[in-house]
Each structure stands twice: as structure tokens, then as C-alpha cells.
Amino acid sequence: MPKHTSRPTTTISTEPLVCNLCGPNAYPGKHCPSCLAYQKAHYYRGYGVDSPGSADFFCVADSPHSIIISRQTDEHVGWCFDIEKSVRQIFDELRRVQRYAPYYGRYTYATRCTNDWLVKPSGKMIQNCSGLLMEELVRIAKPDKPILVFAMGGEVLKAFKLKVQKYGSVQGKLLETEIAGRKVLIYPSLSKRQLATKTGYYDVLRAHMNNFLDIVWQLNHNMVVDPHITIEELTGDYRFPSTLKEVDELVDDILAYALPGKDPRTHAISLDTETNTLFAHRAQLKVLSLTVAWDKGKAASIPIEHPDTPWSLEDVRPALKRLFLSSKPKVFHNGKFDLKILARKGFTVENVRWDTMCAEHLLYEDKKKFYGLKEIVAAYFPKYAGYEDKIHDILHHTERQLDEMEKKQAKEETVPKPKESKAKKKLRRDKGYSDIALETLNKYGAIDADLTRQLAMRQLQMFEDEDRTLRKARQQLSIKPQFRAIAAPGTSDPQPLMTLMKGRVIPLTKILADMELTGIRVDREYAEDLSIKMGTTMLNARIAINQMVPKALNEEFNPSSPQQLRSILFGTGYTNPETGEQVCYKGKEQEIGVEYTSTHLESTNAKLLRSLVTQRGCALSRQILLYRAMEKAKNTFIANTLALSEEDGRLHTNFHITGTATGRLSSSDENMQNIPEKISVKVNIRGKEEDVVHNIKKVFSVTDPENQLFVNADAKAAEVRIYAAYSRDKNLIRALIDGMDPHSYFASMIYQRSNLLADVPPDQHKATLELIGIDDYHAWTYEDFQNSKVFLGDKRKGIVGTDPKYGSQLEKLRKNIKRVVFGILYGATPNKISSIVGITEEQSRVIIATLDRMFPTIKEYVTHTKQQVQTLGVVETYFGRRRRLYVRNLPFNLRNKAERQGVNFKIQSTSSEIVLGVLCAIDEVLRRDLGGQLLLTVHDSVCFEIPKKYGAQAVDLIEDYGVKRVGKLCPWLPVPFKWDVTAGPSYGEQTALDGTGTKEVVEDPDAFIEQEIKDELADAG
């Protein structure tokens, strides 16, 4: 073992100060004057050990650019920005482990100069500075060992002249190169830009650092560290049957295999399928092979429909069926995909017990893009990192050939083809592993199965370890009386993660697989017609917009162009179509809360446009919002839906269990969680202004329109009901039990003049009422908010309102309250709420202050949850789902964000858990007793189709399983979990079922932006 008699020098002052702003050039010769940063940016020195031959390792970031707010004041001291401090802190914590304690590092950059304007180093800068970096590494690294580099960004690899397809594809893999005749081992990890976006990425960073320090330890113990482990070494004990007899013998051996005296869970087998397509519903689907593992290092691959397979699917069906129906516990990684694939081929898999992708999400809920098997393997089993490179190189080569061929064809075409939708291109290139030779596919597929099983065994232990560690932390914290409430667990279940896996994740996986495979019928004729009509409406809308735009523009105005819109809103102004006056917001940027881009230009995003509509009644902004919504709906959603449903007339959306940190589902192909609502646009047609309504949800209908109903059960104000459970607010609980609409209730309480003005000096009463939009004539009662349509009327139906102006203001104020309440419950800050909702900060302040006074439990809940984040680092729902927010190692801005995310998490996660529980509960009853089929789940709703004769029973079904059953399973819920149940021939044509008949569903004309606002508030939290 190496001896360390003294601590290396850690001063940062011995490196000479070379800064072309403050002294001589950093780089001798001509390089600095040719650089973009020359005399525009400061030079930053490295940090850590800097004596010659003293560094055991180097941590290299791309540049000193500060991604987020920093309290750094010295213009030349590097690695002192907030994210960089967090990185150093994690390294220091890991080095407290005895085996890593003797090793010291140097923290430096691939490029040394930066400024606010210089977000990303250019290729020229990297080239110029690489000589400085190489000299630093050779000078400070220990002379008798390879140079070890922990890389934080793709620019670092460029400095070493290493070319990779994508930086993300090599993260967690050990790379090798050479400088000045010395071997260099590089471990690429997350960049500072990535670390600035998600708190969960610090878990990935920590795992990478741990692996890297292990390599440091191995090298200092003269152990061989080889980044190029061979596939033959990994697959030495694998089996690859070549006859049907060998297939039968393999299955017999797997079923008979057991580990005497060990936990029965270790008898599990892992399964994985390799296919020629990513879409299970496609006619071209072939299961190229099935891979299985039954112990560490024991795996096999059974060819099935690969072109080189010596038998047919039917030949091996009996053997595979025995395997799938056996009592052996089954393990998958992203099992939803494999279950769909096998179901298409007529197989059912019994005793599914574990999904390693979902288990990883239960352990680390916020590391999006790092739930793939190869990413997890790189973190847990570094010797396997990069095992799939050969297959990915083949696939990349095929993609590159297709790109070149398409470019060549495009040049030869005389008439350009219309732009292809993203989905259409994805389908056209969907070949899966069909180009991979069987021998290669067998080996790599079997490694997948082997690693999946190894990972499952490790995760089982991690579940137990975390439960034990958290229990101990809570016990220690609860010793102090003031921390007992904070230390209390969310659930009494001693093993909540295991319960979630067995009781929620696995059942949900099976049901979602069935829903995805079934798909939802697309009325393609209607969708195509709608696309044409929307194109016409968009053209007319552009004409209407152009009439507001100054004629002096030298080019046609494009509503999607931020640059042109900015020049009008904050430059020339636009013409109000009603008054004819010129409107411009230049000089009012601060007043309306304008945000700025990274290039210091006024942002023209949706938040600003909504603010202008709400605060200023901006006609141009409203038309732009509508136009952009239509453009997105037509060119993205409808175009992709038509492409994805072309083969069988159905959309087979892909639900993602690991898509959000809260446990809510996300989806893709196509994103049904973001399905546009009805869009109503006023356009001038032949000199006459008309309302044109585009019903996008109508695209989705039942399988048999003559005999079936499309039912949508939507949880009513789910988040507010969950808040009532966590806050125990007596007034809110009473209102919900009495069946009151929570948003009208909040509005009536807040906008009562006596409540609103309680803490306002008398001389400011009038100004406050004017600020909020309340007069002293109307009542502003709960009944009035509920009956706003009576006051407002309906021009389209010829119904004259009793007080249209009052009705309009009631609707506006109710929406504002609804949005503000959601923002608070989601943990958004007041200024974020103001900018997203589209009200002034002053209005937001008054409303929030009144809410805090009327409902003090809101503030108490928020404060309590933030204290849990600060002291325990974990918040837990009633179901035991956890959000890990260890703020100690986070930069300042992410620390604040983590506290808000804790507030957001409890509400959203608990609500989602109940909705998904109802989805799972009704599945079997729906199919068995009502002849129905689950189709979708969107946010807090569940959609299914049933025969028309059972329409009335849909309400009973939801009452039994969505209200009564939820009440029994959730005794902590003090209010009924109510639902709005609607039905109709399609998703977009719905009437409310009340048990005795139907009543019209009242449509919100601004519904298309309501969900957008809600999503933004959730993201802000």
C-alpha cells in the first residue's frame, strides 16, 4: 500500500496570474490575440494541489462559465462558483472513506477565460487552450502513474482531440488516450450545464465520482485498470443453443436451478427480448431473440425470428411457454415493452416480480435520461460500461448511411418533398436490431439479461438499506421534541418501496402494456379534414394579425418569430383593432415583468404574452398565443398522430412510469399528456368576423361508434383534496364535504371585501379593490362565482346575460385564484406565480397575503415540508413514495428549488397515486363485467370505452372504485375523492353523466392555455 507521509500543497496562489485583461497573455505567442475571449474575459486559475508531481487525479470542467447565480467575487480564482463548490464538496465527502483519503486532486478547466456572454467555449478557444491544459496535467500529475481525468463536459474531450457521437453516450465509460507519451484515462461524467437543471443529477454524479475514485485506488495499488474489457470475457459461461433439443435442455436446467440455503428471491430469472422494431403493434414485428439469466454470469440467448434462426417460432413455443408460465419470479428492465412484444406473439408471462428501471426510479426519482440499462450499469457495474458499444456503432453507421442517401436524393429531386413529420421519419427508420448478426445479437442480448438480474439483486438490497438508514435518521432526529413532527414518516408501512413495487408498479406495468397494445382509434378522416381547416384558419389568423402589424416592416410578419414580435411589442408597436390606437410596451418592461434571454433581449415567450393579455388586454398577444397553439396542434400533434396511426388506424401511445419525479405518468408517440384542447379563434372571413372552433380531442373515438361510448372520468380538484388531507384545514374540509366547488370557494373567500381589506389601511381600500378588480356594488359570493354563466350569457346560443361585465370578471377572478392556489400548492414562488399566471406582482402579493390569512394551514404545510427537506433531506407521501432532496450538496438556487419541489411532490404524487390506483382497480371489472377497455390516462383522468348499454353503469363503476374504495384504502383522506364522469362518441364530444340523464359540459374558451399554465406552475415548483 502506498505511503503518504505528508499532505500535498493545496494552495491556489503559486500559479502565476496571467490574464489578458489584467496582465500578460496566458498563452505565449499568438494564440490569445486570436481568441474570441481576448481582452473580453478574465482568466481563471485551477484549484487544489499544484506542486509538480502531486496530483492523484484531475477534475476538468469545460470552462469557468457560471451557469447559475454565484457569490464568487475573485475574478481569477477558479472552481469557486456554486456548482463547482458542490462538485468539490462531494469529492471531499467521498474521500472521507478510508481507502480514498490519501488521494488529492486538481480542479481545472479545458478553457480558462469566460464571461456572462460566453456561455459555451468555441472550437477555436478549446484548440487554443488545450496546450495549457496538457502542460498543466503533465506538470502536476504523479509521474509514475497514468494521468486520471474526471471530465465534466464534451468540450473536455475535444481538448484531448477525442471524437464521440454524443457526449451522453460515453458518460460513465472509461476512455483512453495519450499526451506527451503518457497514458491518460478519462472518465466522462455530467457537465455543469446538466447539474444546473436537476437535483437528481447529483446522485448520478456521486455514483460516477465513486467509480472514478475506485479507479484511482486501484492504480495506486498497482492493479490493472483496462477500459477495453472483451465481450468474450463477459460471456464465457453463457449458453447459445443451436438445436431444439438444446433449447429444451436449457429451459429444463433454468427451471430446475436453485441456490440452496439462499433467499428464494435469488431464484429469479430475468428476461429480455430483442426485436426489429420499437413499436409492438406494427405488422413487421419480429422477436429476433429471447435472452434469459438465472444467476450471476449465467445467461443464454434463444433465437426466435432472426433471419439466421434454424427454427420457427412455433418450434420453440412450447419451451418458451413453460418458461413464461413457471413459478420462477420474473425480472425485466422496462418490462412494459417486453410484455407487449410477447403478448403480440401470443405469450403470457406469469409471476412478474421486478422491473429494474422502475426500481431505479423508486430509489432515484429525478435522474431523467439515466434510467436506461446502459446508464445504470455504468454507475453500478463499471467494468461492464460500454459493453453495448459495438451494436450502437453498427446502428449509428446504418443511420449515417440513410442520412447520406436521403441528402443525395433530395439534391436530385426537382420538386421538393413536403416536410416530413418527426413521427413519420421515426417510423420509416424503425428497424430495431434487424441489421445485427445473430452471433453478435446473442452475446449482447444475453449480457442485457445477466446485468438486469444482477441489478435486481442489488436493488433489493438497496431498498432494505435505505429503509433502515432513513428509519435510523428519523429516530435520531425525533430525540429533539421540536423535530418530532418533521421526522414522522409519511406512512406506517415499514417497507414502502417494496410495497410500491409489488402493489403499484408491477400491476400498472401490465395494465399499461395492454392499453398501449390496444391503442385508441383515430378518426383519420376527421383528423385530415381538421388539419386542412386549421391550415385555412391559420392563414386567416395571419391576415388578422398582419392587420395589426405596421406596414413599415420590410418582411412578412411571422407569428412564430420571437425577433419580429419583439421588434413590434418593444419597438414599433401594433394597432389595436378595436380602438385603432397604436400600442407599444417600450419603457414598461419592468412594470409588466419582462424576462430576458441569455443574450439580454426581451423574451417573447408564452408567459409574457399571457401577462400582456391578462394585464393589458393585448389583442396582438392573444392572437399570437392562439396562432402558436394552432400551429403546434396542426404541425406537431395532428401530423404525428396521423403518421403513427397510419398502419392500423389506432394511436399506440407510450406511457412512461419513470417520466416524472412525482410518479405521474408522461407519454410519447404521441404525448397524450399534452393533448391540445378545443381552440377557438376569431378570424375575418370575407369581411365578417367569425368564431372558428377546432375540436382536437374529437380525433380520438371509440372502436365501434355505433355501439360504444367513450367515457372520461376526471378526478375533481384532486390536488385541493390532497392538500386538505395534508393540511387538515377545517374550513376547506367542510366545504369539500358539502360538495362545494373548491375554486369558487377560494374565490368567494378571498374576494370578500372584508377579507381582502382586513390588513389594508382605510386610505388604501379603494386602490386595493381597483388593483384586484373588485367593485363595492356586487356581492362576489360563492353562488355568483358558480353562476357566472348566467351573468355572462352565451352569444353563440343567443342567450343574453343578466350582467355580462360582472360575469366576465367573475370568470377571470376565479381563474386567477385557481392558478394562484395551484402555484402555491406546487411550491412556486410569488414572483413565478405572477409571471406564469399573468397578473402583476402587486396583485399576486395581495391575493397570497389574503390566502395566508384566511387559510393559515397553506403556509404551515409549505413551511413544514420545507423543514423536512432542510433537516431530513427526504419527503414522503402517505403511500411511501419518496422525494430525496439532499440540499447540503446542492448549489444555492437548486437548494431553493429543492424546497419548492418537496412541497410540489407531496400534492402531485399522492394525487397521481390515487388515480393510478383507480386505473388498476377497474381494469379487470371493466373488461369482465362491462365488456370495456381502458384506453388512456391523462393527468388526473381515466378514459375507457364501453358498450352503450352500460353507459349508466360507468358512474357506478367510478363511484365504487374511485370514491368508496379510495375512502377505505385511504383513511387519512378527510374528504371524498370526487370525479366528473362524462361520455360521448369521442374524446372531444362529451356530456356529463349524472346517473339519470345527461347535461351539457360547459367548455372553457381558454382551456387550451389552462393546462399549459398548470404545467408551468408545476415545473416552477
Regions from the PLM with identified roles:
Residues Q218-H306, E350, A379-F381, Y387-E689, ...:
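Conserved "right-hand" nucleotidyltransferase catalytic core of DNA-directed polymerases
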Residues K145-L148, F324-K330, N554-E555, N707-V711:
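Short active-site oxyanion
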Residues K417, K425-S434, L508-L517, T614, ...:
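Conserved catalytic core of nucleic-acid polymerases
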Residues V87-R95, K161-L174, R182, I186, ...:
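Metal-dependent phosphoesterase core characteristic of DEDDh/y 3'-5' exonuclease domains
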Residues G48-G53, F57-F58, S66-S70, E75-Q98, ...:
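Conserved RNase H-like, two-metal-ion catalytic cores of nucleic-acid enzymes
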Residues V955-V963:
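Short amphipathic alpha-helices in soluble, non-transmembrane regions
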Residues P2-H221:
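A polyanion-binding, active-site-adjacent surface
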Residues E360-K368, P559-S560, R566-F570, I750, ...:
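Short, conserved secondary-structure transition motifs
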